[in-house]
Amino acid sequence: MPAEVAAGLPPLPPNHFYFYPPDPLLEGDGAITAIEDSDPFDQYVYRLRRVLYQGRTRWQNVLIADTYNYDRVLMLDGAIQSAESDESLYHELLVQPAMLAHDEPRDVLIIGGGEGATLREVLSHASVRRAVMVDLDRELVELCREHLFQWHQGAFDDPRCELLAEDGRAYLERDPSLYDVVIIDVVDMLDNGPAQALYTRQFYELLHSRLRPGGVVAVQGLEFSHSDDKPHAALARTLRSVFSQVHSYRATVPSFLSSWGFLLASDWLDTNHWQAEDIDRRIERKLGPLWLDHLDGDYLKACFVMDRETRFLLAQPGPVLEDGVPFVAPPDIEEIEFGPAQLPALART
């Protein structure tokens, strides 16, 4: 942006947007510029074709807009939460590995997932008889129902769906129902944010008690890049303190401007034994060969492959996330000297 324009702007409050008026350089198409200010060190600028909704629910700032690069986007508290151009990649990666791993998922719990795309992916499985979606923000869900049909594709109206507007942890505390698969698709663990209590050991212990034998949990695993991997590693350690098998995987989600992490947690599923051919057969048997846009056996196997430094990081001991205790990142991995002798067996798998 021109320095003289930037100098005249008021300071940006954290987790908010600042909107420029239409940009005359874009040939009079009325484009609006939005600055994403969710990172304390970087800001990202987006050209918006059209703003469909801008406002605040009880819980968060919301912007739904059409963009030039990512088509329609949902932005929450100053960051892109989901984009039409790549939401199917993200949601397939979050949901389908757990659903494919379970032989016959019948009862599924979704915590978060307000856009409805997580629900859409769950309901793609004919075996599902009940999909309970618990999202704290009723207003956001209604906005997504109105403006983000490409995401939910009518899933909210499926008779198998039970939609509840309440805190996911409170729901588990009051309802003793058991589930075959649980999908956690909540916003990042911002300090003092409503989702913070959904990332702790105590929450996962409660969640574990609501799984049937053979159950699988899939978790949105935060940014998982070389510049920001410690929160994911802490989340993986926390899950390992409760579940016998925890496996990280990641993929680049373009609209997130980073690699993104996911986790599978259970007491039985070892993804190291997965074969691409077996995954392809499960997809064809459970969904049909043309259902998924992105996922197949080769790609999913590749998502679990980590570089040597990341394997070392994930194998390190460290604190887990606890109720009421802020997360403090350990020293950078570059500050730790390591070689083959220091690489634990877990890090070599």
Curated annotation (Swiss-Prot):
Residues that, per the record, bind spermidine: H91, E115
GO cellular component: cytoplasm
One GO process term, biological-process aspect: spermidine biosynthetic process
Keyword annotations from UniProtKB, A to Z: Cytoplasm, Polyamine biosynthesis, Spermidine biosynthesis, Transferase
Residues binding S-methyl-5'-thioadenosine, per UniProt: Q60, D135, D167, G168, P194
Major localization listed first in the record, in broad terms: cytoplasm
GO MF annotation terms: spermidine synthase activity
Complexes and interactors: Homodimer or homotetramer.
Official protein name in the record: Polyamine aminopropyltransferase 2
